[in-house]
């Protein structure tokens, strides 16, 4: 259960989603999760770890991208799965500890 969430994704876009409720009273948190995780398992894991009640969970499979390695060699980045956890505006998760 605890190993489903790998790490939080802290980017400019995820910070904007987390700090500014967009007209609605909801907060969005983005996590990198295991490939075999599903929505119900993620909701239960977030509930147990952070003691909050998620309203929704959205899952995105991020595909690998082409990258130039050394000289003329090409490679790919790894694919991963990320989850967007939706919370009520009254609840929050302290990600940066």
Swiss-Prot record:
Family matches, as Gene3D superfamilies: 3.30.70.330
The UniProt similarity line reads: Belongs to the universal ribosomal protein uL23 family.
Q: Which domain of life is it from?
A: Bacteria
- Function noted in UniProt: One of the early assembly proteins it binds 23S rRNA. One of the proteins that surrounds the polypeptide exit tunnel on the outside of the ribosome. Forms the main docking site for trigger factor binding to the ribosome.
Write down a Pfam family by its short name: Ribosomal_L23
Record's Gene Ontology CC terms? ribonucleoprotein complex; ribosome
Q: Does the keyword Cell membrane apply?
A: no
Q: What is this protein called?
A: Large ribosomal subunit protein uL23
> Known SUPFAM superfamilies for this protein?
Ribosomal proteins S24e, L23 and L15e
Q: Which InterPro entries match?
A: Nucleotide-bd_a/b_plait_sf, Ribosomal_uL23-like, Ribosomal_uL23/eL15/eS24_sf
State how it assembles.
Answer: Part of the 50S ribosomal subunit. Contacts protein L29, and trigger factor when it is bound to the ribosome.
- GO annotations under biological process? translation
Lipid biosynthesis: is it a keyword of this entry? no
**What are the alphabetically sorted keywords of the record?**
Ribonucleoprotein, Ribosomal protein, RNA-binding, rRNA-binding
A molecular function (GO) held by this record is: rRNA binding
Q: Which organism is it from?
A: Brachyspira hyodysenteriae (strain ATCC 49526 / WA1)
């Amino acid at each position: 259960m605890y190993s489903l969430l790998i790490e939080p994704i802290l980017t400019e876009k995820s910070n904007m989603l987390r700090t500014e409720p967009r007209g609605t009273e909801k907060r969005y948190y983005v996590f990198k999760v295991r490939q075999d995780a599903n929505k119900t398992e993620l909701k239960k894991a977030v509930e147990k770890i952070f003691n909050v009640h998620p309203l929704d969970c959205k899952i995105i499979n991020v595909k690998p991208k082409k990258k130039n390695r050394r000289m003329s060699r090409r490679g790919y980045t790894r694919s991963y799965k990320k989850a967007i956890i939706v919370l009520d505006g009254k609840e929050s998760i302290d990600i940066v500890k």
